[in-house]
Swiss-Prot record:
Protein name: Interleukin-1 receptor-associated kinase 1-binding protein 1
Annotated compartments: Cytoplasm; Nucleus
Tagged with keyword Plastid: no
InterPro entries: IRAK1BP1, SIMPL/DUF541
Protein's GO biological process: immune response; positive regulation of canonical NF-kappaB signal transduction
Originating organism: Mus musculus
Post-translational modification: Phosphorylation at Ser-55, Ser-61 and/or Ser-63 is required for full activity. Phosphorylated on at least one of Ser-234, Thr-236, Ser-241 and Thr-246 upon TNF-alpha activation, which favors nuclear translocation.
Family to which this protein belongs: Belongs to the IRAK1BP1 family.
Domain comment in the entry: The disordered region interacts with HSPA1 and HSPA8.
Length: 259
């Protein structure tokens, strides 16, 4: 599976501290006039601000949610009608077995092809089955192998992800990284007796995604020898994100004494 490159780091949010309100009639500085990507961090632009700067990282993964299995049925006869009859008989058995298992028509695709081979006719049919439950997939494949003869060939399953899975995983990694950074900042403020305020800057500094494990390169050279679990592991996608956040820091509010 070819994954698209992740976008570059970008600033998600930058809020001006409350102390800067009321400056509408004052000229802005050269640093403030720069684009967001070139402006210094809030702590540098506002040296008097009370802030905490933290980073957060996260890595998430998702197993494939689809599997494609192809069942091929073929027959070669001197008469075309006999070749068709032989293939269609087994084809009907396969489709009926799938219907009994509750498969919807949109998850099953059937194609047929007949051609001349010297002085005979060769009929071939393919049944492409999309599975969402891998346990049911194994049971059905084992059942068809037991019930049908050697002229029926069942391909190994091909595991894949539905469209949009990689982008959804990238977003999830970023959100978890932000949550981890927020928890870190919260613990720091609790430790020093302060109150964590609103975020002033949220920036994703690094994001990446990949398929399979980094140590699976040897297994990928022999795809025909992989077990089902190894194939699922090899098709699993991963995403990592690293964020930088600046939070406002507030002092602990003192409780008023009631007379």
């Amino acid at each position: 599976m070819s994954l698209q490159p992740a976008p570059a780091s970008r600033v998600f949010m930058e809020l001006v501290p409350w102390a800067d309100r009321g400056r509408e009639n004052h000229p802005i500085s050269a640093a403030e006039a720069q684009p967001i990507g070139r402006r210094p961090h809030v702590a540098e632009a506002h040296p008097g601000a009370r802030e905490v700067h933290v980073s957060g990282a996260a890595e998430v993964s998702a197993s494939p949610d689809r599997a494609l299995v192809t069942v091929r049925v073929s027959s070669t006869k001197e008469v075309s009608a006999e070749a068709k009859k032989s293939v269609c008989r087994r084809l009907d058995y396969i489709t009926q077995s799938l219907q009994q298992q509750g498969f919807q028509a949109e998850n099953v695709t059937v194609t047929k092809n007949i051609r001349r081979v010297e002085n005979a006719y060769h009929m071939e049919a393919e049944v492409c089955i999309t599975f969402t439950e891998f346990g049911k997939m194994q049971n059905i494949c084992n059942f068809l192998v037991e019930k049908l003869d050697s002229s029926v060939v069942i391909s190994p399953p091909e595991f894949y992800h539905t469209p949009g899975s990689v982008e959804n995983l990238r977003r999830q990694a970023c959100l978890v990284a932000v949550e981890n950074a927020w928890r870190k900042a919260q613990e720091v403020c609790d430790l020093v007796g302060q109150t964590l305020g609103k975020p002033l800057l949220i920036k994703e500094e690094e994001t990446k995604d990949w398929e399979g494990q980094t140590d699976d390169h040897q297994l990928s050279r022999l795809p025909g020898t992989l077990t089902v679990q190894q194939k699922i592991k090899s098709a699993t996608i991963h995403a990592a994100s690293k964020v930088f956040i600046t939070f406002e820091v507030k002092g602990k509010e003192k409780k008023k004494k009631h007379l």
